[in-house]
Swiss-Prot record:
Residue(s) at site: Plays an important role in substrate specificity: H236
Location in the cell: Cytoplasm
Disulfide bonds: none
Protein name: Serine hydroxymethyltransferase 2
Encoding gene, per UniProt annotation: glyA2
Record CDD domains: SHMT
Record family assignment: Belongs to the SHMT family.
Pfam name, any one: SHMT
Pathway terms, separated by semicolons: One-carbon metabolism; tetrahydrofolate interconversion; Amino-acid biosynthesis; glycine biosynthesis; glycine from L-serine: step 1/1
Subunit architecture: Homodimer.
InterPro entries, per the entry: PyrdxlP-dep_Trfase (IPR015424), PyrdxlP-dep_Trfase_major (IPR015421), PyrdxlP-dep_Trfase_small (IPR015422), Ser_HO-MeTrfase (IPR001085), Ser_HO-MeTrfase-like (IPR049943), Ser_HO-MeTrfase_PLP_BS (IPR019798), SHMT-like_dom (IPR039429)
NCBIfam families from the UniProt entry: PRK00011.1 (NF000586)
GO molecular function, one term: pyridoxal phosphate binding
Cofactor(s) required, per the database record: pyridoxal 5'-phosphate
């Protein structure tokens, strides 16, 4: 019987050598990231070290279970990697329990619901239309189908959370779980008010801090952990790690339930290469310079929104306390779907986004969402974000004047974007 011999280059060939077709895709995406200004609030740019860990030999290792209690042998080194991630996360957020295994923020939220509520129970979260997230009980999501999901919103006058409505809904529906946090809410959330309401009706209180976790880690945003029974987050966005999820708590009983919900409840083997990359990112976030970065993210968001407002746009809620903002396009009689495409042709990446009380359909929208984490990672400061705000206004004014044939304004802005991106390169040598 002939023994198998790996084909030539199996252990040595690069992607370019082994798969030129895919290599072209990777090169094109690298160029896109290098040449476009990334303003999508949920995206960031990881360090070379995080990239290296995510592409490491740990991708080969199956490790069902938890450190010291695996269902496979050979887990000595991945145990160390996972423990590093856990201990660094505990240090970052000042908590006693962390699970770093969720593959995503949605998986982290799903694990909380599997652990703490039953199908048919009532949960309460911010509506998608008000800036919440799909996984907080939106009708199309699993959480909206499996649970009796009650949704609260924001006030018409200032687009801030309507705590009178939150209290009334909680008293009326007696939810088992109340959720704070969202994907398009730019203001600091009053966690103490939520805690008070949850205690009044006997509910557990969960905070999804996926968007602002990096600001919390830097000490520049109030931490939800003193108030919430359970906290979930992604590990990318402002935390600037690989794409993934995490669950945190100071309640050991809840921690045991979460561990069982993550594995074997929702997932099998954890992605050990991603957990290693999380450990690297958490180590970076523990450095003093990360606080400087996080402060710059906040300062840059204010500079960007000031420039957009000066250009005749409305900023939902009047501004931002965080890394993101919602821009109301109605003063220029534009819609988010058209603006997103025009800005992308100018090499500025945003996403169309509904605004509170939006009259447009979700596929159209009256707004766009912008964020500063990725641009700040490149090195953009307030001067650059002021310029970026002006470039956005230039594209939008062209759209308002010329309709969808906005090629002249897009070309002019694209040239200015190229100059800016060349000044702040990323991933040299890749």
């Amino acid at each position: 019987m002939t023994a198998y011999t790996p084909w030539t280059g199996f252990f040595s060939a690069s992607v370019a050598q082994a798969d030129p077709e895919l290599d072209r895709v990777l090169r094109a995406e690298l160029s896109r990231q290098q040449d476009q200004i990334e303003l999508i609030a949920s995206e960031n740019i990881v360090s070379r070290a995080v990239l290296e860990a995510a592409g490491s030999v740990l991708t080969n290792k199956y490790a069902e279970g938890y450190p010291g209690k695996r269902y496979y042998g050979g887990c000595e080194e991945v145990d160390v990697a996972e423990e590093l991630a856990i201990e660094r996360a505990k240090a970052l957020f000042g908590c006693s329990y962390v699970n770093v295994q969720p593959h995503s923020g949605a998986q982290a939220n799903g694990a909380v619901m599997m652990a703490l509520v039953k199908p048919g129970d009532t949960i309460m979260g911010m509506s998608l239309a008000a800036g919440g997230h799909l996984t907080h009980g939106a009708p199309p999501a699993q959480s909206g189908k499996w649970f009796n999901a009650v949704q609260y919103g924001v006030r018409l006058q200032d687009a801030s959370i309507d705590f009178d409505e939150v209290a009334t809904l909680a008293e009326t529906h007696k939810p088992k779980l109340i959720i704070a946090g969202g994907s398009a809410y730019p203001r600091i959330i009053d966690f103490a008010k939520f805690r008070e309401i949850a205690d009044r009706v006997g509910a557990l209180f969960m905070v999804d801090m996926a968007h602002f976790a990096g600001l919390v880690a830097a000490g520049l945003h109030p931490s939800p952990l003193p108030y919430a029974d359970i906290v979930t987050t992604t590990t990318h966005k402002t935390l600037r790690g690989p794409r993934g999820g995490m669950v945190l708590s100071n309640n050991p009983d809840i921690g045991k339930k979460i561990n069982s919900a993550v594995f074997p409840g929702l997932q099998g083997g954890p992605l050990m290469h991603i957990i290693a990359a999380k450990a690297v990112a958490f180590g970076e976030a523990l450095r003093p310079e990360f606080k400087v970065y996080a402060q710059a993210v906040i300062d840059n968001a204010k500079a960007l929104t000031d420039a957009l407002a000066a250009g005749g746009l409305n900023i939902v809620s009047g501004g931002t306390d965080t890394h993101l903002a919602l821009v109301d396009l109605r003063p220029k009689a534009l819609t988010g779907n058209i603006v997103e495409k025009s800005l992308e042709r100018a090499n500025i990446t945003t996403n169309k986004n509904g605004i509170p009380f939006d009259p447009e359909k979700p596929a159209i929208t009256s707004g766009i969402r912008v964020g500063t984490p990725a641009g700040t990672t490149r090195g953009f400061g307030t001067a650059e974000f002021t310029e970026i705000g002006k470039l956005i206004v230039e594209v939008l004014d062209g759209l308002a004047a010329n309709g969808e044939d906005n090629s002249q304004a897009e070309a002019a802005v694209r040239e200015k974007v190229a100059v800016l991106c060349r000044r702040f390169p990323i991933y040299g040598g890749l």
